[in-house]
């Protein structure tokens, strides 16, 4: 499987006309046991961070070996081994574990400080986390230096910081940098880079990456791959194909499935037709409990309220606004949502007072609206 993934990445990069010089850190460069004397005498970038030096199938053995070494090391040597363990975890996308190790390490030497910075930055970027107020700027990171995967890390930082211009400058060579990463990182990051290429309309790279997805069934069949195919079709103006594929992705449970439901709702609201709105209502209602918490749940409820309102179903719209207030009372949007709900309630009770609802339906609705 490891060779299959690597060959697939290389094939895609050849289609993208990535220079052969960036295809470094092939599996033959990996080492079972880190020889730091050799690394220190070699390329600095590999000394800072090289996730491909770890065997993709050797987590248990590598970890056992590193733990055994820890017992016999002291001082700077122990720090070095702990950073090796953090890098090992990162190579397998165990980012929480890698971050926990790094939090316990206090590097003393310039070389160790540099490596600690590179590892810490890599954990943040692979996790997709934006920098905090105390995070040093990326351009001071070892990952921004003379590395074959510099554009890869720069693109992840641009995505995390919403820097569209820097992302546009780095997205194309970032696919070359992706080839220097282990398969666990490729699986995790390929959808992120593909989405960036879609939004930047880098069609040649999008087409090649979508073909690569076809050779990785675990991604192609996942909601992420399905959603991104739909988004690519939508970006190219093929709304019918996009809607069909979005509906497939919306049947899942992860964040890409939620985003597919939101996309279906947005397309229906833009269309305005009753059939499209009813389809969006069904999609949103069917998945309203599939994702709880955070901005995605809030966005689903907001879209559902808008769809109800567009269909003239103000009672369900106001009840949905009530759900939002119950679920997210501390959000900044709470005050305008409450005002919107009060306005809709006034309209509903005015209509009820004017006899626009059958008496039995009005009584049942009134009971539902009671706090």
Predicted regions, residues:
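Gram-negative bacterial Sec-dependent N-terminal signal peptides
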Residues: 1-35
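N-terminal leader/linker segments that initiate helical-solenoid repeat arrays
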Residues: 24-80
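Residue-level recognition of tetratricopeptide repeat
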Residues: 87, 120-122, 156, 195, ...
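Helix-turn-helix repeat elements of alpha-solenoid scaffolds
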Residues: 53-64, 90-101, 122-135, 159-172, ...
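Post-signal peptide N-terminal segment of secreted/secretory-pathway proteins
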Residues: 67-133
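Glycine- and small hydrophobic-enriched segments that form the cores of compact globular domains
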Residues: 106-112, 116-162, 166-169, 177
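Generic helix N-cap/helix-start motif at coil->alpha-helix transitions
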Residues: 42-46, 76-82, 93, 109-117, ...
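Solenoid-like repeat scaffolds
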Residues: 33-40, 67-76, 103-111, 136-148, ...
């Amino acid at each position: 499987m490891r060779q299959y993934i690597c060959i697939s990445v290389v094939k895609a990069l050849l289609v993208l006309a990535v220079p052969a010089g960036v295809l470094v850190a092939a599996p033959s460069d990996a080492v079972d046991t880190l020889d730091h004397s050799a690394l220190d005498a070699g390329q600095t970038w590999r000394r800072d961070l090289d996730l491909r030096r770890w065997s993709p199938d050797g987590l248990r053995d590598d970890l056992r070996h590193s733990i055994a070494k820890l017992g016999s090391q002291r001082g700077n040597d122990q720090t070095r081994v702990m950073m090796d363990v953090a890098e090992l975890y990162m190579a397998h996308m165990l980012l929480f574990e890698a971050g926990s190790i790094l939090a316990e390490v206090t590097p003393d030497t310039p070389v160790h400080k540099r490596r600690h910075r590179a590892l810490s930055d890599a954990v943040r970027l692979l996790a997709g986390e934006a920098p905090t107020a105390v995070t040093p700027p990326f351009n001071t990171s070892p990952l921004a230096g003379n590395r074959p995967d510099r554009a890869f890390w720069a693109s992840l930082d641009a995505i995390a910081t919403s820097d569209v211009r820097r992302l546009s400058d780095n997205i194309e060579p970032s696919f070359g940098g992706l080839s220097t990463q282990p398969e666990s990182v490729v699986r995790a990051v390929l959808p992120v880079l593909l989405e960036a290429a879609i939004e930047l309309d880098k069609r040649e790279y999008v087409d090649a990456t979508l073909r690569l997805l076809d050779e990785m069934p675990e991604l192609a069949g996942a909601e992420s791959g399905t959603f991104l195919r739909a988004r690519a079709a939508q970006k190219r103006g093929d709304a019918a194909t996009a809607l069909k594929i979005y509906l497939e992705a919306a049947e899942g449970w992860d964040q890409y499935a939620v985003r597919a439901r939101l996309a279906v709702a947005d397309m229906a609201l833009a269309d305005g037709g009753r059939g499209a709105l009813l389809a969006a209502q069904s999609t949103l209602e069917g998945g309203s409990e599939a994702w709880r918490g955070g901005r995605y749940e809030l966005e689903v409820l907001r879209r559902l309220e808008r769809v109800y309102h567009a269909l003239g179903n103000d009672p369900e719209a106001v009840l949905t606004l009530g759900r939002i207030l119950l679920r997210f009372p501390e959000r900044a949007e709470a005050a305008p949502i409450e005002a919107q709900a009060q306005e809709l309630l006034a309209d509903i009770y005015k209509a009820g007072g004017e006899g626009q609802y059958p008496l039995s339906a009005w009584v049942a609705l009134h009971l539902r609206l009671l706090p």
